[in-house]
């Protein structure tokens, strides 16, 4: 089958379209091309750059489609008939198809057109998302609608007519229609009572709309009202009248604190916001209240007096740094479970210590307290004294407070505390006694540098699938990203029930010897990653008898020190250790020759230098063999170029998962997998494998998952996977495969659950066999309709393999050949008789003229290896001669001969500047077939003419080629003896300019002949045979 060339002929396109329709009708192709049918009746058409809604085949189970996602396409026009065929459609996502110009990445203007009955034709529709589309009015909507999103559009007016008839609507989102990213000429206008007809509306979000007041006439059924980041700076009871069913109210960001803003901010007017004391007095069912970023300096207790059911209160990003030490506002909030006071700092000030107000002690249901970003330097028992007797308190967030002295033992007095976050502070060690009593630095303030004080990024998570988290443990303390240099046992006094300790990203550089964590007898997870630990002592961490997970990754500095040894024998002395990470330490030499443990089940050894360790003979050959219970082993990024069978033979036989990602393996001995009899998952992604041709997966292997993605595999041997009968998941994505053959799998193909072939340059030739095979196993191929793409031919590159049905498409090369042959036959059949009848004699004459011309042209092409036909030499000092050369000779020979034009070399035009005169002259003589001397007279020749003539004579002597052609403009002038002799021997190489105009035509014909033919043919055979080449 030939490759595709050029554009498809319209007839071919028509035939292929018909073939595709037939295939779809037969149900052989994926039913919802170009989209993908996913679970629960969802048809996913995201990111396909569609310009219209796809109309699926009648043979597709359109009645089973309940959700259609058209997110991030280019659909600018919605027709009445677009969704008629989807009779069971309940959810429709049209987000990001025609965004407003200000929200578009390229700021292109766009306008979406929606015809009147587009959505009315879908009476079952319940959820509709039209966010991020440039629409200015609410389209006609079916009464069945339950959820409607019109956020980030250009809708600026809401009146009763817009939403009439939507009696089932419960969720309405109209966020961001008028703010700095989506500017507008006016704020969103909600007419009084515009939403009153929505009797079942429970969720209303109007954030980022430049509203200056709460819309009037809201439906009393509202339970969630979100009005944050508008310009509502006054709230009174009448603003929320009749909203007695409210459960969540968000009015934060309406009067902002701009020194902590991360986006354009308008300063809150002085004396605002103004919240009437009874604003929330009638909201008895309120469970969540957001007053964040509202420039509050004080809390009025009357605000919360009637909120007995309040569970969540967000007061972050205000100015409550003094209020929280003396307020009584929390005394009536017995049901409050979460309180956020983050970033209530004094601008440019850090307090020496902080004492929470006694009213915190009345929050008997409090479970989580966020207090990061308040900026106090000392954490002592008096700081949290008000919280000690809260029986439900589980989570305490104190990160990013610039704390440099912390009495960690105070957390032992909190019986229900499960998580304490002290990360991103400046804690450097155990708190001194004076500081712990709170006697020093009382009330002192330290000025801080100005700047953004946003919360820093979270730490890097542990290795996925290897290190467990701490969410299920009873007590976790996070001290990551502090200034700890050493660990002292006194730091953890009274913390014996601590089960998870996070110390990553400090500067701990001490040699751990088994005494640092002695009080932590219940510790199960210890994270010491991103430090500088010295593992010299053999009893490191042995004081932790219950330790199950230990993360020592990214402690590479000690291992990079030349000549320093490292002792890993402590692993054998941790009886409960199940997870260990030594990743990214660049371990390569002077370490224990063998790791031993009877309990370890997962080891992350990625990012080291096993290639250097295993290059030391048998010194580290048995490095992992002593891990008798090891199930998972990660050897990624170890710079491995080869993996010998004896190396695999010395890995633990209990292994079930082996990762070898991102090494340099160009060869793998597949038969050696029998040496790991329990191996179920093998990850070889990101290596340099180019072919799977050396043998096959061995018979009897337990392998279930094989990842070969991101290699350079272009060939797979027949039956390579066939013997691995337990294989269920195979990843061949991002390779160089041009086809996928069923012969690779044998009977295994029908049992595969995952076969990933995305990112391969598949060759989409007509009749490609891989299409039939992928259709047979399409349930196992992720992204088959839209993400399995062609790599060739060029016109299909980057397109889905179903852009045309490769099983029924026409052979492109054969199509063009047949088309060309038929066209030629018809043309000749019509043209030959007609031309013979009309101009037979003329054609006969032209035919013989061409026969006479072709041999001459052939000879000329054979000899024409030089860039110029003639080098024109004349005396520039004679203006008449120069004028004749430029305006007569050049025009006649170069411009008026058509396709027989000659290439002349002229001194003024073709000589290269920067070269000497002789270099240019030499190049011109030897780059031209002939030398044309234009002379007014022949008796006195000097200068350039003489030098050129001597070079021509030299060429005659050296190359035996006579290249001289003379043109004499004054025939009556005295002729030299050389000219007369040349006229006698080679008359056609001496041409005289005729005085009569009638003879000029003959002159130009003779000159053309003289310049295009060899002078050998012009010599008079009676006198001379001309120059001959010596044999």
Curated annotation (Swiss-Prot):
LRR repeats: 62-85, 87-110, 122-147, 150-166, 167-190, 198-221, 223-242, 243-268, 283-306, 308-332, 333-356, 363-386, 390-413, 415-440, 470-494, 496-519, 520-543, 545-572, 574-598, 600-622, 627-650, 652-675, 676-699, 701-723, 724-747, 749-772
Membrane protein topology class: Single-pass type I membrane protein
Pfam families: LRR_1, LRR_12, LRR_8, TIR
Cystine residue pairs: 35-45, 98-110, 178-184, 255-268, 258-265, 470-500, 764-790, 766-809
Lipidated positions per record (S-palmitoyl cysteine): 258, 265
Family annotation (InterPro entries): Leu-rich_rpt, Leu-rich_rpt_typical-subtyp, LRR_12, LRR_dom_sf, TIR_dom, Toll_tir_struct_dom_sf
Extracellular side: 26-817
Glycosylation sites: 64, 129, 200, 210, 242, 340, 474, 513, 567, 669, 694, 699, 731
Position of the signal peptide: 1-25
Sequence positions that bind DNA: 47-51, 72-77, 95-109, 132, 152, 179-181, 208, 262
Family: Belongs to the Toll-like receptor family.
Designated name of the protein: Toll-like receptor 9
Upper lineage: Eukaryota, Metazoa, Chordata, Craniata, Vertebrata
The gene coding this protein: TLR9
């Amino acid at each position: 089958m030939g490759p595709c060339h050029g554009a498809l002929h319209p007839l071919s396109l028509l035939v292929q379209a018909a073939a595709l329709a037939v295939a779809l009708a037969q149900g052989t192709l994926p039913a919802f091309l170009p989209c993908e049918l996913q679970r629960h009746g969802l048809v996913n058409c995201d990111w396909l750059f569609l310009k219209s809604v796809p109309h699926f085949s009648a043979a597709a189970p359109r009645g089973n489609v309940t959700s259609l996602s058209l997110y991030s396409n280019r659909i600018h026009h919605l027709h009445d008939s677009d969704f008629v065929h989807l009779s069971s459609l309940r959810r429709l996502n049209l987000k990001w198809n025609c965004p407003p110009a200000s929200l578009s990445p390229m700021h292109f203007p766009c306008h979406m057109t929606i015809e009147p009955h587009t959505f009315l034709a879908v009476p079952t529709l319940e959820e509709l998302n039209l966010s991020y589309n440039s629409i200015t009015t609410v389209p006609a909507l079916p009464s069945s609608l339950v959820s409607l999103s019109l956020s980030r559009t250009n809708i600026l007016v809401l009146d009763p007519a817009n939403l009439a008839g939507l009696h089932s609507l419960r969720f309405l989102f109209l966020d961001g229609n008028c703010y700095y990213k989506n500017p507008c000429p006016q704020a969103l206008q909600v007419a009084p009572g515009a939403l009153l007809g929505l009797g079942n509306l429970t969720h209303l979000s109007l954030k980022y709309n430049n509203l200056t007041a709460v819309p009037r006439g809201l439906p009393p059924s509202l339970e969630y009202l979100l009005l944050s980041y508008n310009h509502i700076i006054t709230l009174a009871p009448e603003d929320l009248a009749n909203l007695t069913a409210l459960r969540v109210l968000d009015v934060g960001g309406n009067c902002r604190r701009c020194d902590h803003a991360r986006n354009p901010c308008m300063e809150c007017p002085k004396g605002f916001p103004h919240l009437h004391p009874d604003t929330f007095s009638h909201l008895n069912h309120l469970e969540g209240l957001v007053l964040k970023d509202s420039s509050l300096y004080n809390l009025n207790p009357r605000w919360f007096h009637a909120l007995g059911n309040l569970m969540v209160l967000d007061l972050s990003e205000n100015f409550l740094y003094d209020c929280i030490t003396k307020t009584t506002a929390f005394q009536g909030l017995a049901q409050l479970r979460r309180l956020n006071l983050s970033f209530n700092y004094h601008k440019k000030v850090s307090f020496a210590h902080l004492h929470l107000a006694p009213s915190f002690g009345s929050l008997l249901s409090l479970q989580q307290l966020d207090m990061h970003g308040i900026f106090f330097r000392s954490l002592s028992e008096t700081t949290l004294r008000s919280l000690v007797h809260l029986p439900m308190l589980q989570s305490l967030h104190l990160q990013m407070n610039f704390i440099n002295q912390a009495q960690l033992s105070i957390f032992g007095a909190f019986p229900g505390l499960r998580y304490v976050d002290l990360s991103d502070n400046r804690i450097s060690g155990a708190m001194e006694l004076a500081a712990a009593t709170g006697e020093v630095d009382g009330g002192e303030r330290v000025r801080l540098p100005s700047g953004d004080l946003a919360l820093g990024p979270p730490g890097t998570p542990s290795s996925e699938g290897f290190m467990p988290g701490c969410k299920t443990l009873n007590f976790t303390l996070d001290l990551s990203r502090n200034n700890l240099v050493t660990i002292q046992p006194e730091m953890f006094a009274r913390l014996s029930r601590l089960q998870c300790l996070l110390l990553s990203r400090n500067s701990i550089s001490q040699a751990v010897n088994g005494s640092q964590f002695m009080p932590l007898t219940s510790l199960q997870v210890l994270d010491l990653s991103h430090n500088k630990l010295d593992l010299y002592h053999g009893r490191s961490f042995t004081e932790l008898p219950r330790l199950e997970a230990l993360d020592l990754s990214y402690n590479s500095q000690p291992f990079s020190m030349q000549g320093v040894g490292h002792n890993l024998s402590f692993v054998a002395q941790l009886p409960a250790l199940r997870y260990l990470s030594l990743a990214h330490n660049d371990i390569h030499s002077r370490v224990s020759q063998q790791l031993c443990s009877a309990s370890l089940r997962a080891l992350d050894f990625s990012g080291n230098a096993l290639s250097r360790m295993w290059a030391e003979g048998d010194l580290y050959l048995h490095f992992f063999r002593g891990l008798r219970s090891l199930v998972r082993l990660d050897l990624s990024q170890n710079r491995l170029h080869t993996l010998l069978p004896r190396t695999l033979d010395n890995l633990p036989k209990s292994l079930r998962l082996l990762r070898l990602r991102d090494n340099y393996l160009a060869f793998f001995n597949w038969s050696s997998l029998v040496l790991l009899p329990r191996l179920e998952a093998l990850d070889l992604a990101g290596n340099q494998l180019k072919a799977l041709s050396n043998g096959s997966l061995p018979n009897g292997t337990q392998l279930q998952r094989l990842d070969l993605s991101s290699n350079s595999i272009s060939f797979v041997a027949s039956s390579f996977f066939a013997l691995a009968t337990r294989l269920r998941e195979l990843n061949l994505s991002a390779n160089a495969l041009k086809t996928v053959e069923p012969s690779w799998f044998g009977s295994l193909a029908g049992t595969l659950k995952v076969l990933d072939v995305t990112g391969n340059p598949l060759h989409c030739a007509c009749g490609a066999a891989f299409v039939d095979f992928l259709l047979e196993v399409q349930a196992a191929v992720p992204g088959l309709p839209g993400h399995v793409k062609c790599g060739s031919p060029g016109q299909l590159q980057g397109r889905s393999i179903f852009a045309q049905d490769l099983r029924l498409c026409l052979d492109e090369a054969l199509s063009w050949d047949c088309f060309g042959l038929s066209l030629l036959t018809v043309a000749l059949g019509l043209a030959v008789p007609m031309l013979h009848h009309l101009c037979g004699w003329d054609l006969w004459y032209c035919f013989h003229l061409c026969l006479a011309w072709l041999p001459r042209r052939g000879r000329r092409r054979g000899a024409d290896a030089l860039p110029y036909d003639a080098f024109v030499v004349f005396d520039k000092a004679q203006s008449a001669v120069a004028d004749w050369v430029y305006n007569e000779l050049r025009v006649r020979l170069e411009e008026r001969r058509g396709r027989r034009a000659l290439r002349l070399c002229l001194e003024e035009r073709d000589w290269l500047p920067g070269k000497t005169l002789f270099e240019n002259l030499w190049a011109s003589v030897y780059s031209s077939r002939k030398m044309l001397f234009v002379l007014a007279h022949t008796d006195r020749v000097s200068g350039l003419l003489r030098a050129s003539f001597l070079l021509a004579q030299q060429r005659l002597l050296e190359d035996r080629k006579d290249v001289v052609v003379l043109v004499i403009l004054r025939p009556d002038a005295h002729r030299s003896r050389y000219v007369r002799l040349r006229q006698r021997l080679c008359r056609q190489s001496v041409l005289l300019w005729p005085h009569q105009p009638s003879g000029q035509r003959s002159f130009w014909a003779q000159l053309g002949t003289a310049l295009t033919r060899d002078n050998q043919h012009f010599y008079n055979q009676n006198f001379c045979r001309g120059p001959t080449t010596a044999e």
